[in-house]
From Swiss-Prot:
Keywords from the UniProt entry: ATP-binding, Chaperone, Cytoplasm, Nucleotide-binding
SUPFAM superfamilies in UniProt: P-loop containing nucleoside triphosphate hydrolases (SSF52540)
HAMAP family named in the record: HslU
NCBIfam families: hslU (TIGR00390), PRK05201.1 (NF003544)
Protein name: ATP-dependent protease ATPase subunit HslU
Lineage, uppermost ranks: Bacteria, Pseudomonadati, Pseudomonadota, Betaproteobacteria, Rhodocyclales
Subunit structure: A double ring-shaped homohexamer of HslV is capped on each side by a ring-shaped HslU homohexamer. The assembly of the HslU/HslV complex is dependent on binding of ATP.
Pfam families according to UniProt: AAA, AAA_2
Length: 443
């Protein structure tokens, strides 16, 4: 779990997301509260439950990006799911319990990777020993009663040094490695994903004990053997126990597109039980016990962050019980021209920098003037206002259209430099931006 303070978390998010200070502050406080709660003694600690967050705002303003960046900062089990993928129990589709099962799988995978990193050096030493045993086999005994003669340690150390310096990387050796687990694709009715996983696990375990001889370059052999040795050194039971504890105490679930399961009060017609999905989410968000193949998981202290554009519905269209489970509400603002400018220039991997790097591979020096960037931001904002407002995603469309010609011609003789100023932007985009009918289809 991260030990960053709320200002530090917001500062990290600022490197990738423009504006939306209130949303960043809310998720930073929620993340820090997980750390604070862990330092409180029982029985008070078990009484402190996370305050779930509902983020409301138009598409393309940073809701999903906040979730993506938060996942990297959290250092805790994290899963992002779309609410539209789930249906009420009894309908065709996935039921909401699979969210927690998937979260457990993610936590165990992350835990195993961390454990393998801890024993990596020991595993590499063991892998080197196995390769050296192949390169320098023990001398054959003269009689049956005499033991095998070990190789001179000085020779072994000399070969180990060559091995570590990469001098033997391309030499091929024949080694005995565990055979790859049997891959069996099993199709089962919706709602039976756990049974499917158990059957697949059974088939995979059938082939785990088998070993086979393979001829490989030493570079690849070392990697395979190191992975095999690391898997032997870690304690799977400890990994699973720690993963289950981390999910229960520090797990974070990001529910995207939650507005799509909010049925409008004035809506009528076919509906695959949107309210049913909401009712199924209720116990999950409030706190219940979910059965997984690794054990029972309590969801009482899992943090839920929901987000939605709420274009066609309102937060009040959610059933009242679910509304009450998200006490913290944050509204994200639409992007202004200034925001578009900052997205193009001030984030760590801004679009202008990405295109400069892409075209540099073909020997084209691309540069943007401040006036050109301002004009780009104005056009993106205008098109959003005149047609559908898709937020920052409009910049992808505008930039692709702007640089279409140079991207196509890059690599040809004479195409080695381009400066994007206001005049160039107008020449390429102004006609399209002014004609609403064209902008609707092209931009």
């Amino acid at each position: 779990m991260t030990q960053m303070t709320p200002p530090e978390i917001v500062s990290e998010l600022d490197k990738h997301i423009v504006g939306q200070a209130r949303a960043k502050k809310a998720v930073a406080i929620a993340l820090r509260n997980r750390w604070r709660r862990a330092r409180i003694d029982e029985p008070l600690r078990s009484e402190i439950t996370p305050k779930n967050i509902l983020m409301i705002g138009p598409t393309g303003v940073g809701k999903t990006e906040i979730a993506r960046r938060l996942a990297r900062l959290a250092n805790a089990p994290f899963i992002k799911v779309e609410a539209t993928k789930f249906t009420e129990v009894g309908y065709v589709g996935r039921d909401v319990d699979t969210i927690i099962r998937d979260l457990v799988e993610i936590a165990i995978k992350d835990g195993r990777e961390r454990a393998m990193r801890v024993v990596r050096d020991r595993a590499l030493d063991a892998a080197e020993d196995r390769v050296l045993d192949v390169l320098l086999p023990p001398a054959r005994p003269v009689g049956f009663s005499e033991p095998a003669q070990p190789q001179d340690s000085a020779t072994r150390q000399k070969f180990r040094k060559k091995l570590r310096e990469g001098e033997l990387d391309d030499k091929e050796v024949e080694i005995e490695v565990a055979s790859a687990p049997m891959q069996a694709e099993i199709f089962a009715p919706p709602g039976m994903e756990e049974l499917t996983q158990q059957i697949q696990g059974m088939f995979q375990n059938l082939g785990n004990s088998r070993k086979k001889l393979r001829k490989l370059p030493i570079r690849e052999a070392l990697k395979l053997l190191a992975d095999e040795e690391a898997a032997r050194l870690i304690n799977d039971e400890e990994v699973k126990t720690e993963a289950l504890r981390a999910v229960e105490q520090n797990g974070i679930v990001f529910l995207d597109e939650v507005d799509k399961i909010a049925a409008r009060a004035d809506a009528h017609g076919a509906d695959v039980s949107r309210q049913g999905v909401q009712r199924d989410l209720l116990p999950l968000v409030e706190g219940t016990t979910i059965s997984t193949k690794y054990g029972m998981i309590k969801t009482d202290h899992i943090l839920f962050i929901a987000s939605g554009a709420f274009h066609l519905s309102k937060p009040s269209d959610l059933i009242p019980e679910l509304q009450g489970r998200f006490p913290i509400r944050v509204e994200l603002e639409s992007l202004s021209v200034e925001d578009f400018e900052r997205i193009l220039t001030s984030t760590d991997a801004c679009l202008t920098r990405q295109y400069e790097a892409l075209l540099a591979t073909d020997g084209v020096t691309l540069s943007f003037t401040p006036e050109g960037i301002r004009r780009l931001a104005e056009i993106a904002y205008q098109v959003n206002e005149k047609t559908e407002n898709i937020g920052a995603r409009r910049l992808y469309t505008v930039m692709e259209k702007l640089l279409e010609e140079v991207s196509f011609e890059a690599g040809k003789v004479g195409v080695d430099k381009l400066t994007v100023d206001a005049a160039y932007v107008d020449a390429r985009l102004e006609v399209l931006a002014q004609r609403e009918d064209l902008a609707r289809y092209v931009l």
